[in-house]
Design a protein with these regions (language model features):
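Short, glycine/charged-enriched secondary-structure capping and boundary segments
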Residues: 1, 27-30, 49-50, 123-124, ...
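Active-site beta-strand/loop signature of hydrolases that rely on acidic residues for catalysis
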Residues: 1-26, 72, 100, 107-111, ...
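Short, surface-exposed linear patches
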Residues: 5-12, 35-38, 92-95, 129-133, ...
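Structured beta-strand-rich core segments of catalytic domains in phosphoester-bond hydrolases
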Residues: 12-14, 18-104, 181-182
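Conserved residues at the C-terminal ends of beta-strands
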Residues: 16, 114, 171
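Metal-dependent phosphoester-hydrolase catalytic domains
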Residues: 21, 77-88, 128, 132-142, ...
C-alpha cells in the first residue's frame, strides 16, 4: 500500500496504524524521507509478532506487532522532526500526534485518534493545540490522519472530507477540495490493500 500511495511522487504522506517492525523500511518502500513514531510498542519482538498476527489478521491486528504513525516527505524538501505527544488518556489505547516541519513553510501534524465521538474530539483538540504550538511564525498548519470522526469541524481550518474518518485539515494557506480514493484505486489484483481510503489534497 505504501508503494501504491507513493508511486505518483507526492511531497508529503501521513500514515497511521503501521506495524512497528515496518518503520525501519519506510524510506526504502517509499523512496521518501521517513519520520516514524511508535504509538504502541509491540508485545512480541520482530517476526514472532508478525507470524502470530498473520494467523488471524482481523482478530489480532496490532496487538502483537505494535502500532506506529509516520510522516513521509519528498527527498527534495528540507524537513525536521518537531516531536510528538500522547493524546490519549491513561487506560485508553495509546495514541499520539507527531509534528514535522517541511520546507520552512508548513508544519505537518499526523494523528490517530481513538474510537468514540467524545474521546476522538478531545484527542483532536489536543492534536490541534500541539500542532499550533509546534508551528513557527509564517508556517501553515496541516492536521492530518485518522480522526475517527465523520462529522468534523475545526474553526479556522479547511473543510473535512465527507463520509470518511480520515481527514486533511489546513490553516493558513489555500487548499483544494479533498479527494477520497475510490475502492478500485486501492486494489491490487482484486485485493483491497487498506480498509481506509487515502485522502488527497493540494496545498498552497
Amino acid at each position: 500500500m505504501i508503494e501504491l500511495v507513493c508511486e505518483d511522487e507526492p511531497e508529503v504522506v501521513c500514515l497511521q496504524e503501521l506495524p512497528v517492525w515496518g518503520t525501519s523500511r519506510l524510506a526504502e518502500w517509499s523512496a521518501m524521507k521517513a519520520f516514524p513514531v511508535v504509538a504502541r510498542p509491540p508485545r512480541m519482538p520482530g517476526r514472532v509478532g508478525v507470524r502470530v498476527t498473520r494467523m488471524n489478521q482481523g482478530f489480532f491486528r496490532s496487538a502483537f506487532v505494535g502500532q506506529a504513525n509516520a510522516v513521509l516527505v519528498s527527498r527534495s524538501l528540507v524537513a525536521e522532526d518537531r516531536g510528538y505527544l500522547r493524546i490519549s488518556d491513561p487506560g485508553r489505547e495509546r495514541r499520539v500526534v507527531q509534528a514535522v516541519g517541511v520546507a520552512g513553510r508548513y508544519v505537518i501534524a499526523n494523528l490517530h485518534a481513538n474510537h468514540g465521538a467524545e474521546v476522538a474530539q478531545l484527542e483532536t483538540e489536543r492534536s490541534r493545540t500541539f500542532a499550533e504550538t509546534a508551528s513557527r511564525p509564517g508556517e501553515a498548519i496541516v492536521l492530518a490522519g485518522d480522526f475517527n470522526l465523520l462529522d468534523l469541524r475545526l474553526d479556522g481550518y479547511s473543510a473535512a472530507s465527507a463520509g470518511v474518518v480520515d481527514h486533511v485539515l489546513v490553516s493558513g494557506v489555500s487548499v483544494s477540495t479533498p479527494v477520497v480514493w475510490p475502492r478500485e484505486r486501492r486494489e491490487l489484483d482484486g485485493v483491497v490493500l487498506s480498509d481506509h481510503a487515502p485522502v488527497d489534497v493540494t496545498i498552497g
